[in-house]
Amino acid sequence: MTIIRKKHPLIKIINHAFIDLPAPSNISSWWNFGSLLGLCLIIQILTGLFLAMHYTSDTATAFSSVAHICRDVNYGWLIRYMHANGASMFFICLFLHVGRGIYYGSYNMIETWNMGIVLLFAVMATAFMGYVLPWGQMSFWGATVITNLLSAIPYIGTTLVEWIWGGFSVDKATLTRFFAFHFILPFIITALVLVHLLFLHETGSNNPTGLNSDADKIPFHPYYTIKDLLGALMLLLALMILVLFFPDILGDPDNYTPANPLNTPPHIKPEWYFLFAYAILRSIPNKLGGVLALILSILILALMPFLHTSKQRGLTFRPITQTMYWILVADLLILTWIGGQPVEYPFVIIGQAASIAYFAIIVIFMPIAGMIENIILDLD
C-alpha cells in the first residue's frame, strides 16, 4: 500500500496534499475551516445536482418545480433545505476562515490570499444566482436590484444590464442563464480551490504563533485528518439541526410568494450573508459610489498584505491591534443588522457611520496600531 501511495502518479499527489503533508504541530481548530469549506462545497454540489434533476428554469414553472421537489420528490424537502442552509453554513465557514486569516496574518502568503479573494467573489456570485432560481418575490426583485447596479457604470452600463438580462427586464432569459451559470460555477470554484491549495502547499501553513514552524512538523494524517473529522461532524450536526428544526429561519417569507413584476415587496433585501455589503452599498447616496464601495468592501482584503506594518505576523501578542480587530468584527455585525433594516432614521446614519468605520479600521487604525506596537517593542 505504501508503495502505491508514494509511487502512483495520481495517488502520489493526494498523498503529498492530505497524508504525508508536513503540518505545524500547533495549529488550532481555527485551521479546520479550510477542510470544512471543502465539505460544504461537496454537499452543495451533490444536493444541487439532485435538485437540478427536478428543477425547471422557466419563469412559468420554476416556482412550481421547487414546490414539487419539496412535496413529491423522495426526500426532496431534505435535499432542498440542505442546499439552502448549506449555503449559510458555507458562508459562516468562509467568514470565519477569512477572519482567521486576518487575525493570524495569513494574508502575508500573497498568492494564496489573492486566490482566496477570487474564490470569495466566485462563491458570492454563485450564491446570488442561486437565490434567484426559486423565482419567488425576493428572488425576482433581488435579481432586478442587484443586476441594475451595473447600469451605474458610465457609458456601457445600460447596455451591459440589458445584455445580462437578455431583454429589457429580468425574465425567462435571465432565469435560464442564471441557472446555467449557477450550475457551472461550483465546478470552476473546485478548480480554483485546487489552485488555492497548490499555492498554500508552496509555503506551508501558518500557525498561531506566526513563527516559522519548519523545525516542528507532524504528518497531516492521522493527526489532522482526525481533527478535521471532528470539525466535519460538528458542522454536519449544526447543519442538520438547522435543516430539520429551523429550515426557514434564515430565509425570507417573501420568497414563498411567486415572483410578480407588478408588485414590489416593502423591503428588498438579500440573504443574511450579503447584508453587510448591502448596508455599505446603501450608505452612499450616489449609485456609482455605492457600487464602488460594495466591490471595495471585499477587494480591500487584497490591500491587507501591503497595510501590514507590524514586526510580528499575527495578532497573538499584539493587544492594541487585537482591540481594533474585534471592533471590526463588531462593526461587521452592526452592518449585517443595518442591511436588513428599512432605509429610514436612525438606520441610515448608523449604516453610514459603520461603513466609514469599516474602511477606516482596515486602512488607517490597524496599520497605525501596528506601528505603535513596534515602538513599544523597541522601548523594551
UniProtKB/Swiss-Prot annotation:
Protein location: Mitochondrion inner membrane
Gene Ontology biological-process annotations: mitochondrial electron transport, ubiquinol to cytochrome c
Residues bound to heme b b566: H97, H196
Cofactor: heme b
Function text: Component of the ubiquinol-cytochrome c reductase complex (complex III or cytochrome b-c1 complex) that is part of the mitochondrial respiratory chain. The b-c1 complex mediates electron transfer from ubiquinol to cytochrome c. Contributes to the generation of a proton gradient across the mitochondrial membrane that is then used for ATP synthesis.
InterPro entries, alphabetized: Cyt_b/b6_C, Cyt_b/b6_C_sf, Cyt_b/b6_N, Cytb/b6-like_sf, Cytochrome_b, Cytochrome_b_C_euk/bac, Cytochrome_b_N_euk/bac, Di-haem_cyt_TM
Bilayer topology annotation: Multi-pass membrane protein
CC annotations in GO: mitochondrial inner membrane; respiratory chain complex III
GO MF annotations in UniProt: metal ion binding; ubiquinol-cytochrome-c reductase activity
Cofactor note: Binds 2 heme b groups non-covalently.
Note in the entry: Heme 1 (or BL or b562) is low-potential and absorbs at about 562 nm, and heme 2 (or BH or b566) is high-potential and absorbs at about 566 nm.
The name this protein goes by in its record: Cytochrome b
Source taxon at top rank: Eukaryota
Keyword annotations from UniProtKB, A to Z: Electron transport, Heme, Iron, Membrane, Metal-binding, Mitochondrion, Mitochondrion inner membrane, Respiratory chain, Transmembrane, Transmembrane helix, Transport, Ubiquinone
